[in-house]
Amino acid sequence: FVTHCKDTKLHNIKMHYAEGMGLLAQMSENIDLDGFSVCLKGDNDARYFTTQADATHFSNCKGLILSENGLYENMMDDAINVHGVYLKVQQRIDEKTLLASFEHTQSYGFDWGFAGDTVQFIRSKTMELLDGTYQIASIRPEDQDSVCGAKVFRIAFTQALPVEVTPEQSIGVENLTWTPEVVFAHNTIRHNRARGSLFSTPKKT
């Protein structure tokens, strides 16, 4: 589990089994995998599966995710999944302040963003982007004393927000600062149950 890290290198590592994901990384910058493999021990391995979920999973990371020269086999899910985490607008306090919440029942209680981050707004029903980007002035949990366990954040911005940013319009918030570039090259993916590679980022892949 990699969180709140920078310039992490995982080289020449073989992972043979995990009850969940093989590698989970979030809120981290620049992750370098070279020869990182999720694989059976060999042709005579008694197991049929390696991980019960994704081999590698990256959520709300930034900088560069570099994954090269790996073998990913016999997973119950993807070899690599890169994505961000949207918040949903729940209340507009004033022209610069919102309450926004995590919506996934298994994904909450961690940092989503920081003062100075840049975000954009998206219509959740059509995936259309609203014009412009906006900078966070301050962000704090609203429903808990700390980020741990929090589902709702109070977010103040440095500039006035579009009039469309209301809960009635079903608006999502994407943190552009915490989106990575991805290089996934010279890897082998085989014998897995689900998909291969998933990249959900507005940056270069």
Predicted feature residues:
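Extracellular beta-strand/beta-solenoid scaffold signature
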Residues: 1, 17-21, 47-58, 82-85, ...
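Short "repeat-start/strand-capping" segments in structured domains, especially the N-termini
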Residues: 5-9, 26-32, 63-66, 180-183, ...
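Short glycine/acidic-rich loop motifs that flank beta-strands on beta-rich extracellular proteins
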Residues: 19-25, 41-54, 63, 76-82, ...
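Repeat-solenoid scaffold signature
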Residues: 60-74
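A generic structural motif
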Residues: 97-102, 137, 141-165
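Ser/Thr/Gly-rich low-complexity blocks that favor extended beta-strand/coil architectures
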Residues: 108-148
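Glycine- and charge-enriched low-complexity intrinsically disordered segments
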Residues: 157-178, 183-184
